[in-house]
Design a protein with these regions (language model features):
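Short, well-formed alpha-helical segments that are part of the catalytic scaffolds
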Residues: 31-53
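Short beta-strand/loop segment that forms part of the nucleotide-sugar
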Residues: 50-73
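Short beta-strand-to-loop acidic/aromatic patch adjacent to the donor-nucleotide binding site
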Residues: 131-142
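Conserved donor-nucleotide/metal-binding helix-loop-beta segment in metal-dependent transferases, i.e.
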Residues: 144-167
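Active-site donor/metal-binding and catalytic loop motifs
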Residues: 244-262, 271-278, 288-293
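Terminal low-complexity segments of carbohydrate-biosynthetic enzymes
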Residues: 269-436
Length: 436
């Protein structure tokens, strides 16, 4: 197939239908520094795995199309993508999507303006006759490898999976927000052990693409900020067949200043809490969890140990207790406040925030979010020192154990979230029990 540079509007007409069975969508905005490598890796992945020379699971030839969903980059991103693809054995279709005024001033936590619009444009481009699988890649990733494409598409094309979530290699200290809140809460709510549900890449089936496009979430504020989490939750709660694919390291091209932790908590945790309200009939019926199969062999990676000031984390927790205790009483019962008070005078090396207490704290904040006991932004920001206290406690417990031991420790935490879930359910059903 010949590479083209055609362009169309995401809200006007879909790209012209082709015989493609696989669509790879790249979401981009001012990614000129990375888009060339991303596009080249996508091209190589398609050629190596799906052109008949290196079959994947018996699939000899899979016709493919590359779709670039660009948000109006002014740095030459689309041109650089076309140059990198060259005479690729795939069709490049550029899909522009409008960004609402203010997008550049209200950047989501993953740093991508109007990401929900970009993903919707890609899904609409993949919702054409004959397409069996769609893979989404972010144009700002520095570490995309050709193997990512068959890893994300293969389980859909060859094994009947509907949603393929990446599993990235991370040091035990990395991805702490995912390990401490997102993963255990997601697992307890939806009953699936999807370990990294907030990342920006995935593979999806035609059935899942159609379900996403039929959902009425695209114009909601929570979707604009946390669309990746919503897509993962939709797959988990919708009865679709899920798996994970090991992709190695993921590093991202950052633009501008990184968001502060409070803003990140507002956006990431706020998305999860908003999803609780929308899927209450699903998660209240879920008990326990089931593992998600890992399809493929993890690539060999070398992980560097981040430098973390544990004493500084503990001091931030203690300062937060002194300054925010009265605010916390609006969302936590007296017993939890007393348990936190006991941590103020503990020597740093013996600082431990128990798993069951941490799970109840997260559930209390979810209930406080639902009941609007405080402005939601203020409520979620007040979670920051509590999260830092949990992080300090976790680092102290895993810093001298091998990676397998750190993984086992997160498993214990996730089990605590499952065990404490009735606490959330009962207070959700009977709000008068809140803060008791």
């Amino acid at each position: 197939m010949t590479s083209t540079g055609s362009s169309s509007s995401a809200e006007a007409t879909k790209p012209a239908a082709t015989t493609a069975e696989l669509v790879v969508g790249i979401a981009s905005y001012n990614d000129v520094d990375t888009i060339g490598d991303v596009a080249a890796a996508v091209r190589s992945g398609l050629e190596e795995a799906f052109d008949g020379t290196a079959s994947l699971g018996g699939a000899s030839i899979v016709e493919s199309r590359i779709l670039l969903a660009d948000g109006g980059s002014n740095d030459g991103t689309p041109q650089r993508a076309r140059e990198a693809l060259g005479p690729a054995n795939a069709t490049l279709v550029e899909v522009t999507y409008p960004r609402a005024a203010g997008d550049l001033l209200d950047v989501p936590y993953h740093g991508r303006p109007a990401r929900a619009r970009a993903l919707r444009a890609i899904l609409e481009g993949a919702h054409t006759p004959g397409v069996k699988a769609c893979v989404v890649i972010d144009g700002g990733i520095r570490t995309v490898a050709p193997g990512w494409i068959p890893a994300l598409a293969g389980p859909v094309l060859d094994e009947g999976f509907d949603y393929v979530s990446p599993f990235y290699a991370r040091h035990p200290y990395e991805g702490a927000l995912t390990k401490g809140i997102v993963y255990p809460l997601f697992r307890a709510l939806y009953g699936v052990r999807l370990r990294q549900p907030a990342v920006g890449e995935f593979g999806g089936s035609a059935r899942l693409v159609e379900a996403y496009l039929d959902a009425d979430v695209w114009d909601l504020d929570s979707a604009q900020i946390g669309i990746d989490l919503w897509l993962a939750a939709g797959a988990a709660a919708g009865g679709f067949k899920l798996c994970e694919a090991p992709l190695g390291r993921r590093t991202f091209h950052t633009r501008g200043e990184a968001l502060d932790l409070g803003t990140t908590l507002v956006q990431v945790v706020g998305t999860l809490f908003a999803d609780l309200e929308g899927r209450v009939d699903v998660w209240q019926r879920v008990r326990g969890s089931v593992p998600v199969p890992l399809i493929g062999d993890p690539p060999a990676v070398v992980l560097e140990t981040p430098q973390v000031n544990v004493e500084g984390l503990i001091e931030s927790f203690r300062l937060g207790y002194r300054e925010l205790r009265d605010i916390w009483t609006w969302t936590m019962p007296p017993k939890s406040i007393v348990d936190l008070r006991r941590l103020l005078d503990v020597p740093p090396q013996r600082f431990r925030l128990d798993d069951d207490l941490w799970a109840r704290i997260v559930y209390d904040f979810a209930l406080g979010y639902r009941l609007r006991v405080l402005p939601r932004d203020h409520l979620l920001r007040s979670l920051t020192p509590l999260y830092l206290g949990w992080l300090a406690s976790m680092i102290l417990q895993v810093r001298d154990v091998p990676p397998e031991g750190a993984d086992a420790r997160i498993e214990q935490l996730a089990l605590a979230f499952e065990a404490e879930k009735p606490y959330l359910v009962s207070r959700w059903r009977w709000p008068e029990r809140f803060r008791t």
